[in-house]
Amino acid sequence: MKLLIIKIDTSQEVEDALSIYAMDNLNALGVESRNRSDFEQAGWLHDSTVVDMDDIKDLPKDTYFYAYFDEEADRDELVKKFQDKMQELKGYGLNIGDAKITTSYIEDQDWNTAWQKYYHVINFSRHLAIVPKWEDYKPAFKDQQLIKLDPGLAFGTGNHKTTQLAMMGLERAIVKKPISVVDVGTGSGILAIAASKLGATDILATDISDESMTATEQNSALNDIKNIRVQKTSLLADVDGKFDIIVANILAEILLELIPQMDAHLNEGGQVIFSGIDYLQLPKIEKSLDENGFKIDLTMKQGRWVGLAITRKEK
């Protein structure tokens, strides 16, 4: 079996929007982003080495976005749809980079192993390290927990700044036990797994895609974690109960949809952790939080990305 690859020379600013569009609207089999600065700058995490630099000499100055489709998919139609989407994003004032689109085909079995060379251990903190399942790694600290991950085609390994900002927020928030967490838009389940490793006792992972449900269940099993439940739903729709922590690493536009739902699902004294926010979109998030009775306790930044620790306003 072959895969059709659509490659777009673009920018970090739109990679998440393209990922969601490809998976949800075009039924892509998987997506991938390669960004040189993400790999080169990852050393800010305690000078840890994420990848060998020889492995990424072919990465772009900014971002290559790849979407993978069945070889029978209509290549020209997909290219046209991506072109239209790029112009739509440009109309929002976002940087779309060169927006050059190219296509190619690859044997499915070649892809299954070739892409793994780009991903290695992320020694995130004294509490957590992210370890792709094909890597051997011993904890760097006595109490360091390992998150074993099989990212597959559709979801990342935790090297993106937005994931790291969300994990920072979780490390700060999970200080008492027992504690319950809902991970909204879980993707590979990495934040839900991190919450479990940090001591959360009851965890719900939600997403709109079947692929995410499967990936989260498989990654939970890989880590021998049994306290993560998965639910296919849009944001917190159809979710029962309240939680001590709500964590969401998703696009700002989707966070704006989530904010009005949070009060009904957050325990008294609970915290919310947001990531995935481009700094240009922060004012809209701040305004919506204020209008819905929330305040920002902590702002975390990496490059153009912003993470937030949020609680209810005092009444």
Curated annotation (Swiss-Prot):
CDD domains (UniProt xref): AdoMet_MTases (cd02440)
Entry annotated with the keyword Ligase: no
Residues noted as binding S-adenosyl-L-methionine in the record, renumbered to the chain: 163, 185, 207, 249
Keyword Nuclease set for record: no
A GO biological-process term: methylation
Predominant location category: cytoplasm
Keywords from the UniProt entry: Cytoplasm, Methyltransferase, S-adenosyl-L-methionine, Transferase
Catalytic activity: L-lysyl-[protein] + 3 S-adenosyl-L-methionine = N(6),N(6),N(6)-trimethyl-L-lysyl-[protein] + 3 S-adenosyl-L-homocysteine + 3 H(+)
Example GO molecular function: protein-lysine N-methyltransferase activity
Enzyme kind, highest EC tier: transferase
HAMAP family reported for this sequence: Methyltr_PrmA
Protein role: Methylates ribosomal protein L11.
Entry protein name: Ribosomal protein L11 methyltransferase
Organism: Lactobacillus helveticus (strain DPC 4571)
Lineage: Bacteria, Bacillati, Bacillota, Bacilli, Lactobacillales
